[in-house]
Design a protein with these regions (language model features):
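Short active-site segment of divalent metal-dependent hydrolases/proteases
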Residues: 56-60, 95, 131
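Residue-level signature of transmembrane alpha-helical entry/exit and packing/kink sites
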Residues: 40-45, 76-84, 99, 103
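Functionally important transmembrane alpha-helices
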Residues: 82, 98-147
Length: 147
């Protein structure tokens, strides 16, 4: 799931969002050091799996999603999806407006994985880690747009 979502997001969703928002793809220039550099690839993947995949999913699916569901019992689907997506996207503001929207769309995907798997956080953690790993490997080989 992570590989497919990364590829579709990178080559289809992000260009469309860029045209609809700022006209620019998400700013991933902070990751240029990864291109052709195994040490940087390993460094960013370690950070990604520990902080992005593990911590973000525990925070967003494990805590925010559950709290939003408790607050918005009367309209769980829309409330939970909107609130968790907005927060998930906002954390990625360093990528610019199109990056905020792109990651905001990722929020409901991970929330869906979490709910479909019976609230299994490991399913979202692994999906998030695989998605980020795919992106970093694309950056390493210099094929990620904007890198």
């Amino acid at each position: 799931m992570g590989v497919t979502y990364q590829l579709v997001g990178t080559f289809a969703v992000e260009p469309i969002l860029a045209r609809l928002t700022s006209g620019q793809l998400p700013d991933v220039s902070g990751f240029r050091s990864i291109v052709g550099n195994e040490a940087q690839l390993a460094y960013w993947m370690a950070l990604s799996w520990s902080l992005a995949a593990f911590v973000e999913e525990i925070a967003y699916c494990g805590w925010v999603l559950t709290r939003c569901a408790e607050i918005g019992r009367f309209s769980k689907g829309a409330w939970v999806g909107g609130a968790s997506s907005a927060l998930f996207g906002a954390v990625h503001a360093y990528q610019g407006l199109s990056g905020v929207f792109a990651t905001g769309l990722t929020g409901p995907v991970f929330a869906g994985v979490y709910l479909v798997t019976g609230r299994n956080l490991w399913a979202t953690i692994v999906s998030h880690g695989v998605l980020d790993t795919t992106g970093f490997v694309m950056m390493y080989f210099g094929v990620y747009p904007g890198i």
